[in-house]
């Protein structure tokens, strides 16, 4: 009985995850206490960061919330950080949590409009290079004024819509019914090749869109949370921020868009896959049927969604309230004026975002450990000890490396605080202070596309509903982001070092 009970516990632990994965998590949990007590808390802290990155990298084996959560519970018990420090980190990042709770749900209620608009774009543009460029540019443009997570949620919603329509039709189901589309077992063998090609096609568009959020987000005061933080510390307004950062952001934006076209033309790094003709036909038929069968109530609903989208853009651009609260406004407007009053239908809108919201809390616990154990402090002190002319370039590199494994806002906060203290104490001129602030801003935004945990939008994409459907793993995201990382990182470093 005891043997079977032990087997049951072992089987239940992390569910269907591979045995080697379960053994790895157990090994991590056994390794951390001796490291903490026998070596040093800092060594255990760095080990924890690496272990958490491992759980993110294996997201398709097991959702990172469970193994990452176990590691962070242990970190709290050991004293690597405190519940109060975690709470303070959550309060500091509460706008992001609000955004995930309400904005992503708000986008869910706009999915009919998004599917309508994106299907026109997808079916109307036959050149894959032009389509990739449009996705990248539109994401960059929107992210300069809206939040990157909001833009990513829009792209994910559209991709899930396309995938579900084709998968249901290919499986012999009604595309308008809520049938499962994650299981390929009902799919006839003749559709498998088309589905694999369609997955590769969607992967490339998703990655172009995700990189676009970073290209546009770096440009303006409202593009990323850390931009607002740095702008506040420097006393820069919208126009000031744009003009100060432009010598770096504009060349990088142009280079990023050129990279997008070249990747599609050369078909490198998993890009260049075309939309299969059979899939195009299915989507075109669906769009035509939708147009023919659309009732006056459905047209009215589309109109309401369009007006809500307009209100959303204006409200975000003018910053009338926190992003999450604007998302709640969108939910209220669309549901009230389209007749969605059933609690179950409302609940479906929150299903996708809540697991990621919980995972983000675990991520902020890692940030709290980094902060409390001062894991980044030696690197910061080393950069500020360099000659003044070397500091901008090295600050860009240091920011990029740390932002690739940690939270952008956290890294920017630490660096701008340290640099401002040095400025106040008379260690540098105002001009040099501004140059370093630009290096911090661009360093936290551009090279951090290297890994999914470097950008919140990338992490959201990795752990979203679309990632397992199109086989977008951590490793594949790193590989597909690599050319962008090299171009954006090298040009960004050169611009910071020689053009400011």
Swiss-Prot record:
Transmembrane segments: 34-54, 62-82, 90-110, 129-149, 150-170, 205-225, 241-261, 311-331, 350-370, 394-414, 449-469, 477-497
UniProt KW Membrane keyword: yes
Domain of life of the organism encoding this protein: Bacteria
Pfam families reported in the protein's UniProt record: NhaB
Catalytic activity: 2 Na(+)(in) + 3 H(+)(out) = 2 Na(+)(out) + 3 H(+)(in)
Subcellular location: Cell inner membrane
Purpose of the protein: Na(+)/H(+) antiporter that extrudes sodium in exchange for external protons.
Name of the molecule in the record: Na(+)/H(+) antiporter NhaB
């Amino acid at each position: 009985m005891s043997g079977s009970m032990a087997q049951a516990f072992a089987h239940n632990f992390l569910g269907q995850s591979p045995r080697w994965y379960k053994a790895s998590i157990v090994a991590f949990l056994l390794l951390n206490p001796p490291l903490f007590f026998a070596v040093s808390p800092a060594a255990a802290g760095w080990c924890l960061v690496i272990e958490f990155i491992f759980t993110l990298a294996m997201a398709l084996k097991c959702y990172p919330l469970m193994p990452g959560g176990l590691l962070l519970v242990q970190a709290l018990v050991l004293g690597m950080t405190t519940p109060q420090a975690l709470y303070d980190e959550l309060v500091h990042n509460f706008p992001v949590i609000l955004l995930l709770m309400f904005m992503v749900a708000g986008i869910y209620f706009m999915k009919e409009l998004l599917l309508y608009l994106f299907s026109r774009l997808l079916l109307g543009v036959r050149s894959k290079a032009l389509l990739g460029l449009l996705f990248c540019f539109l994401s960059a443009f929107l992210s300069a004024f809206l939040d990157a997570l909001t833009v990513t949620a829009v792209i994910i919603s559209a991709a899930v819509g396309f995938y579900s329509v084709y998968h249901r039709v290919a499986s012999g189901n009604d595309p308008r019914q809520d049938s499962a589309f994650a299981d390929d077992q009902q799919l006839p063998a003749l559709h498998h090749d088309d589905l694999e090609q369609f997955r590769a096609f969607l992967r490339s568009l998703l990655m172009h869109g995700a990189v676009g959020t970073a290209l546009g987000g770096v440009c303006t005061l409202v593009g990323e949370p850390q931009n607002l933080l740095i702008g506040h510390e420097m006393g820069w307004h919208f126009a000031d921020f744009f003009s100060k950062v432009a010598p770096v952001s504009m060349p990088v934006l142009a280079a990023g868009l050129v990279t997008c076209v070249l990747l599609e033309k050369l078909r490198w790094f998993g890009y260049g896959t075309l939309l299969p003709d059979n899939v195009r036909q299915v989507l075109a038929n669906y769009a035509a049927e939708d147009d023919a069968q659309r009732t006056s109530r459905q047209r009215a609903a589309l109109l309401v969604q369009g007006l809500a989208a307009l209100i959303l853009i204006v409200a975000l651009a003018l910053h009338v309230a926190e992003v999450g609260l604007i998302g709640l406004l969108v939910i209220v407007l669309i549901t009230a004026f389209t007749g969605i009053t059933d609690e179950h239908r409302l609940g479906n809108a929150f299903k996708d975002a809540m697991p990621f919201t919980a995972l983000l809390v675990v991520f902020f616990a890692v940030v709290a450990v980094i902060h409390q154990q001062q894991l980044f402090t030696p690197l910061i002190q080393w950069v500020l000890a360099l000659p003044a002319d070397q500091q901008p370039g090295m600050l860009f590199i240091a920011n990029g490396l740390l932002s690739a494994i940690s939270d952008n806002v956290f890294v920017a906060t630490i660096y701008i605080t340290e640099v401002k203290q040095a400025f106040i104490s008379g260690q540098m001129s105002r001009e040099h202070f501004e140059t370093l602030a630009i290096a911090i801003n661009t360093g936290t935004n551009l090279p951090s596309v290297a890994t999914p945990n470097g950008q919140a939008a990338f992490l959201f994409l990795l752990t979203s509903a679309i990632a397992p459907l199109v086989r977008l793993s951590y490793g594949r995201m790193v590989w597909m982001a690599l050319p962008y990382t090299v171009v954006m990182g090298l040009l960004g470093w050169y611009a910071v070092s020689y053009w400011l």
